[in-house]
């Protein structure tokens, strides 16, 4: 399974690069199912779907939100998920994803897909933050005591993901989480996608920014590297 974490504010150019990468991976253009649980207002659904419908030919939005009744049974929901290659969590507040998705049948379905080679799951902004073993719910980089952590969806093994990384100066926040919780971290800039295998192996960086990797070793030491689209390392 591929796991795709995007740092937010995705441009059409980067979205098209992602489509091309996935098309090569699947040997055809994949179908996309958007889960907009994180958004604050269901009125945003049409805008979210409209953006991605300009990128992929087959795009569906599943109106799973605490303010909306989707009227789908567990069986209907499972059948719908089976029909799509790429499940994608849009942005907003990651707490909503954790509360509505973690432990839900959708979550179980995605975990079962972990060993499937021809499947992808991803998210942008809050959707990316929810993908790892841990999820940063909130917290200021200037006040570490304000940082709130919970279990993530566990789709990207061994990682905690932070987003809008360079733009919101979240270096200190992520380093604090990595050292305190003894986990690897990746911070992803806006308009940047990091593509992994579900076991944490990095495959590709796409977009205009960097993905910043903070590796925690068993001796409590922290290693840092950062990568751009060309996969160059500094």
Predicted segments, located by residue:
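C-terminal and late-domain segments of enzyme folds
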Residues: 1-28, 39-46, 137-234
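Short glycine-rich anion-binding loops that position phosphate/pyrophosphate groups of nucleotides
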Residues: 9, 92-94, 127
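N-terminal beta1-alpha1 cap of cysteine-dependent amidohydrolase-like domains
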Residues: 1-86, 90
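Class I SAM-dependent methyltransferase SAM-binding "motif I" and its flanking Rossmann-like core
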Residues: 96-100, 107-168
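A residue-level signal for conserved active-site and pocket-lining positions in enzyme catalytic cores
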Residues: 32, 87, 125, 161, ...
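Mature, structured domains of secreted/extracytosolic soluble proteins
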Residues: 76-78, 84-86, 94-118, 226-234
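Short, conserved acidic/polar surface loops in the N-terminal third of protein domains
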Residues: 45, 71-74, 97-101, 133
């Amino acid at each position: 399974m591929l796991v795709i974490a995007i740092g937010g504010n995705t441009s059409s150019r980067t979205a098209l690069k992602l489509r091309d990468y996935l098309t090569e991976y699947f040997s055809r253009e994949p179908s996309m199912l958007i889960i907009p649980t994180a958004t604050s207002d269901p009125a945003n659904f049409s805008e979210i779907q409209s953006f991605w419908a300009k990128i992929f030919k087959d795009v569906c939005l599943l109106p799973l939100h605490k303010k909306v009744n989707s009227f789908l049974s567990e069986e209907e929901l499972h059948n719908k998920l089976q029909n799509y290659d790429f499940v994608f969590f849009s942005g907003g507040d990651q707490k909503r994803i954790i509360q509505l998705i973690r432990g839900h049948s959708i979550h179980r379905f995605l975990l079962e897909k972990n060993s499937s080679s021809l499947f992808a799951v991803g998210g942008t902004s809050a959707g990316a933050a929810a993908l790892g073993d841990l999820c940063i719910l909130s917290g200021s980089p200037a006040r570490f005591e304000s940082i709130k952590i919970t279990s993530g969806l566990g789709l990207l093994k061994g990682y905690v993901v932070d987003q809008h990384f360079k733009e919101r100066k979240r270096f200190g926040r992520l380093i604090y989480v990595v050292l305190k919780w003894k986990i690897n971290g990746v911070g992803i800039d806006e308009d940047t996608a990091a593509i992994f295998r579900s076991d944490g192996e990095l495959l590709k960086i796409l977009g205009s920014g960097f993905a910043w990797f903070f590796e925690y070793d068993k001796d409590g030491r922290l290693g840092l590297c950062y990568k751009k689209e060309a996969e160059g390392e500094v």
